[in-house]
Amino acid sequence: QFREFSLIKLIRNGGLSSGDVFERWIDRLLNGKTFKEMDYNLHVVATDVARGKPVIFNKETTPDVKVSLAVRFSMSIPLVFSFKKFGKHLMVDGSILSEDALHRDWAQDGTPVICFRLKGDYEYDEIKTNGMFPIVQYISLLIRTFMTTISREYINDAFWHNTIIINTGECSAVDFKMSNDQKYHLFKTGYDTAMKIIPIKTNTSTLAPAMFSPKSNSN
């Protein structure tokens, strides 16, 4: 439901999808909340490609910005979702910068920071690049290669202790046709990995299990 792919959008805005449907969906789930209205001290990291630096959204720096807009900036996979302007910034995916943009004392009280790295084992079928207009196929190849490289990127030794690898199996970040069963399995894999590894990384005995929807109700 978030695809809305269009070559016109790619040519005009730098991405196959505007991401507007996703932004409205998040905004609806959050009841239109801004950062200052959040109960938690939430931080969202995006990347300003014009300056090559991270941009951090939170209740101190951007109190009146909607959380949905910041999340929309942060999830902008290049070429898949359009660049979006924010003041003088040109915003894209927050994860394309180095890891040190994420590993910082966000709570300012020494609370440990845990980063989750998604790593897939998927093998893509060969894409044919013949025909009169092979641009779509070439873009698909570029996006897939980019996402595969990101998922297998080397983890700095300094951040290994605070990084948890979640094996997504054959699920890909650019697979927009996953079934409900695949989505549930992906969620369950992340949940089980976190429950198993976080106590080890943080030297705690165990975590209290969280409640989540049963498989039959997954969306």
Task: Go through the PLM ranges and name each one.
Residues 1-219:
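Patatin-like phospholipase
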